[in-house]
């Protein structure tokens, strides 16, 4: 009798769990980067499955910037309490002292100091030799050519010309002292796969992903949510109420909402089947300049 064939989502799940287990067994001090978004929520769910009924054997790290949506931080803390995983948080103390923010210093400087440099500080502080990330190859062209095991030098820099072959799902995790690996268990997933898996597994998400009435400002053709009193308005701008949701999450001044009536997982999946635009069109940091994501990754970004 032939064995039961795995569904598409089951194959992706099995591949990701195998990667997570292999890293946990192979590296001395791994960590899972937790950005609180939908991909991080799926990756956390997979990690819990990988080691069930035991606890996740490595910590989760959130690199905060001080500008995340309030609902993201509340969700992060609630998830840590619910599932009992070890949660580490880090915010760049120098950037905090200088008052670095996306309004006064721009997206490029804010992202470099508060995210890239903040991440490198945390990785150095704890001595992590492998860091899981939730990036997928369908998101953006620089990520499309990145390996599952993404080698980083002692300065956490990525060189796209210095990558290792990954034939037949065989991964080379050998690193010298001070070097590290970024690991992407969701590399072969698509945005639609993520949403269908969330629906199948009933995974909790930040409410911002679902359409609701929210206070937004139209700026440069994008809808920016006024999440707190720090929101700075340009001359002529007005806050208005619109029914919107977010396809991707980050710092609220740098993350655009979209008009949508999708207030349930079923409606979001239906919307995904019809959309032809990139989910990262709402990430203002990606529009700094041509190939900006690859340049950020070369400097140590996620």
From Swiss-Prot:
Give the enzyme's main class according to its UniProt record, as a single word. transferase
Listed A to Z, the keywords are: ATP-binding, Nucleotide-binding, Nucleotidyltransferase, Transferase
Protein EC: 2.7.7.4
Query: Which terms does the UniProt entry file under GO BP?
Result: hydrogen sulfide biosynthetic process; sulfate assimilation
Is Nuclease among the key words of this record? no
Q: Which CDD domains match?
A: Sulfate_adenylyltransferase_2
Pathways involved = Sulfur metabolism; hydrogen sulfide biosynthesis; sulfite from sulfate: step 1/3
Q: Which InterPro entries match?
A: PAPS_reduct_dom (IPR002500), Rossmann-like_a/b/a_fold (IPR014729), SO4_adenylTrfase_ssu (IPR011784), Sulfate_adenylyltrnsfr_sub2 (IPR050128)
Which cysteines are cross-linked by disulfides?
A: none
Q: Organism's domain of life?
A: Bacteria
| Positions of region (Disordered) | 280-302
Keyword ATP-binding (UniProt): yes
In its UniProt record, a GO molecular function of this protein is: ATP binding
Report the catalytic activity.
sulfate + ATP + H(+) = adenosine 5'-phosphosulfate + diphosphate
Q: Which Pfam families match?
A: PAPS_reduct
**Role of this protein:** With CysN forms the ATP sulfurylase (ATPS) that catalyzes the adenylation of sulfate producing adenosine 5'-phosphosulfate (APS) and diphosphate, the first enzymatic step in sulfur assimilation pathway. APS synthesis involves the formation of a high-energy phosphoric-sulfuric acid anhydride bond driven by GTP hydrolysis by CysN coupled to ATP hydrolysis by CysD.
How this chain assembles, per its entry, is: Heterodimer composed of CysD, the smaller subunit, and CysN.
PANTHER family assigned: SULFATE ADENYLYLTRANSFERASE SUBUNIT 2
Protein family per UniProt: Belongs to the PAPS reductase family. CysD subfamily.
Name the record gives this protein: Sulfate adenylyltransferase subunit 2
């Amino acid at each position: 009798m032939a064995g039961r064939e795995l569904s598409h989502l089951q194959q992706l799940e099995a591949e990701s769990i195998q990667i997570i287990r292999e890293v946990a067994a192979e590296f001395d001090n791994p960590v899972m980067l937790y950005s609180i978004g939908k991909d991080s929520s799926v990756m956390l769910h997979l990690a819990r499955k990988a080691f069930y009924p035991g606890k996740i054997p490595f910590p989760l790290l959130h690199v905060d910037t001080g500008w995340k949506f309030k609902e993201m931080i509340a969700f992060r803390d609630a998830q840590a309490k619910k599932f009992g995983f070890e949660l580490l948080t880090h915010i760049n103390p120098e950037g905090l002292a200088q008052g670095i923010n996306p309004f006064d210093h721009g997206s490029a400087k804010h992202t470099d100091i508060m995210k890239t440099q903040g991440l490198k500080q945390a990785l150095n502080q704890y001595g992590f030799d492998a860091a899981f990330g939730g990036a997928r190859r369908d998101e953006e062209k620089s990520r499309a050519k990145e390996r599952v095991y993404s080698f980083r030098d002692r300065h956490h820099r990525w060189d796209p010309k210095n990558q290792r072959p990954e034939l037949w799902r065989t991964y080379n995790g050998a690193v010298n002292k001070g070097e590290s690996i970024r690991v992407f268990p969701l590399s072969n997933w698509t945005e639609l796969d993520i949403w269908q898996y969330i629906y199948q597994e009933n995974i909790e998400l930040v409410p911002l992903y679902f359409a609701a009435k929210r206070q937004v400002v139209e700026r440069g053709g994008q809808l920016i949510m006024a999440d707190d009193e720090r929101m700075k308005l340009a001359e002529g701008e007005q806050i208005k109420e619109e029914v919107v949701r977010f396809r991707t999450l980050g710092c609220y001044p740098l993350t655009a909402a979209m008009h949508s009536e999708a207030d349930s997982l079923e409606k979001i999946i239906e919307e995904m089947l019809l959309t032809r635009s990139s989910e990262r069109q709402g990430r203002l940091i990606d529009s700094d300049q041509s190939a900006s994501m690859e340049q950020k990754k070369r400097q140590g970004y996620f």
